[in-house]
Amino acid sequence: MAFDFKKEFKEFYMPKNKPEIVNVPKANYIAVRGKGNPNEEGGAYQQAISILYAVAYTLKMSYKTDYKIKGFFEYVVPPLEGFWWQDDVVGVDYTNKSAFNWISVIRLPDFISKADFDWAIETATKKKKIDCSSAEYLTIDEGLCVQIMHIGSFDNEPATVDLMDTYIEQNGYVNDINKDRLHHEIYMSDARKAAPEKWKTVIRHPIKKA
C-alpha cells in the first residue's frame, strides 16, 4: 500500500470544521511563485499548477526509470497547497483576485533530496514538454498555527477566518501573519469535480502568544 500523507498525518490534512491549534513541523515542498487571479484561464496560476504536478509525478514514478532515489518508497502525491497574500492590504480583499501573490506547493517526502529534485526538473521539462525551471525546492517551517476545515466556496472564507480569529483571541493567541508566515490553504477536494458548496479546504494561520 502506497504511503498517503493525508492518512498518516491526519492532524494536518483532516482537521475538524472548528478551529484547533497545531504545531506544524518543517517539511520540503515543490514550489512555484507568482501573482495574479487564480481563476484566469491559462493564467500564471494554472501554469504553475501544471508545473507542480509535472515535477511531482516525475518524482513519484522515478522508480520505473533508471534513476534511483535513495530510501524511496511508493507514495500518493500529496494535495495541492497554497500560501497567499496581497501587498499593501490590511487583511484580504477577496474581490480583487488579480492582486493576489501566491506560492503554490506540493509536499515532498523526506527522502527526496535537492539532487533528486533537480533531476526531476530536467526530466519533466524534457519528457512533458513543459518548462519546469520556475519550480524551486522550498523548506517551510510553519510552527505554531491555528487551522480549520473550511467547507464551501473560497469566496466564503472570511466567515471561517472570523471563527479562527475569535478562537485564538479566547485562547490567548494573536495572528502572526507577516512576510515570512502566510495565510495557508490545503485543497482537499478536486474543484473540477465537486460542487463549490462541498469543497473542503484546510485554512491555516500562523499564531503566537498574545
Feature locations, PLM:
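A solvent-exposed interaction/effector surface
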Residues: M1-A210
